Amino acid sequence: ATLPKIGKLRIPLKERTGFVDLLPQAKSYMQNPNFAGRVEFRFELFQEEIDMNDLADFVLGKSVEYRDKPGKNGTVHTIIEFITKKSAAEFYAFIQEKEPFFDEVFLLSGTILEPRRREIINELKNPLSRKKNILLITTQVVEAGVDIDMDLGFKNISLIDSDEQLAGRVNRNACKVGCEVYLFRLDNASVLYGKDKRYQMVREQISVGEYERILREKDFGCLYELVFEKINWMNEQTYVQNFRSGFLRFVEGLDFQQVDRNFQVIEQQNETVFVPIPLPVEVDSMTEGVKERLFSDRELQFLEDFGVVPCEGLLDGKEVWEVYERLVYRDHPAKFDLEEKVGFKIMQRILSCFTFSLVGYSKELQELKGGTGEEKLGYFYLSHWEDEGVNGKLYDYKMGLNNRALKDITFI
């Protein structure tokens, strides 16, 4: 809903490429009350920074207020999104110290493994969960294709269209009234989005009132017109003229090797961390009494062929990794071997359940490399995940990577 009309960019091509709107009257849909009126954005916390303790009190207060409204079922599902995993974990700790209100508090960040992620989403989608007060503490991972329906939302402001994405997880089916999303200032969004033209335009040219209007009227085209103006201006400058004389020539000549060398869409490089933790073979599904399998019969049979079987419903990550090593180090046929290729594909799918990604230059990855594991076979193997210090274990199935534990655990 928030994607720009990139056909408005002035790209110096010999032939103008036509861009077709899949919905020519898209604005009429976006401004329909069933879409635009599902959620009311609130700006009480928008202009002044708030500290973590006051934010926790505010979230609790509004959640209690929603639960007690006439016509509600006496419970509330609240979601709060932070820019950083660190802030999400800190907020979790603050909430635990408050007077108990929520029956369940879930943490969903980029270091939570896929089985736990599915466990959380299934719980939120289970109709019986509507009998509980639930708080979901998350990061931007919740913005991409997570089909949940919450009652109240809170979000650290970042990008306007990102704010709208979070709102898409509140009153998703437009069946409730009184659903709100509160935007607050805690972490500086420039840490993640400082180079993003959308973020720059908001800071330089969009007032608080205009920010509110764009979200209220779903007029994201207004923002992208400013962004396109900036990009078009940059494209006219001498320092990007090599686009016309160099890069464009490679594209027109279908010289894909040169295109690959000269064009990079995503600058940051991620590293994949493997956690050799025991994982459940199945978790509760969104239907009460029914289990969802995390590994297929074929995947479990593949592991069994190497002598690895689940024990008490858990699959040992250390044993899974040893299977991967055996696959890599065994003798490979000189010719193409379909069975071997299929085996590696199955193995990659299994490995993905035990992994998460970190930005290559991030502080937490550099700290992990200070003795918590080793780099091997394309992964960072987190061998010390169970080590525990004053601030808890380095890695926990429900909490993900514990940054605070990195400070007080001595690794050998």
Summary of predicted features, one role per range:
Residues V146-M150:
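Conserved ATPase-coupling elements of RecA-like P-loop NTPase cores
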Residues A1-L3, F82-K85, T138-V141:
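A short beta-strand-to-loop transition that corresponds to the Sensor-1 phosphate-sensing loop
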Residues E49-E81, K86, E90-R118, N126, ...:
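C-terminal helicase lobe and adjacent C-terminal extensions/tails of nucleic-acid helicase motors
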Residues T2-Y66:
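Interdomain hinge/linker at the junction between the two RecA-like core domains of SF2 helicases
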Residues P127-E143:
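Conserved two-lobed SF2 helicase motor
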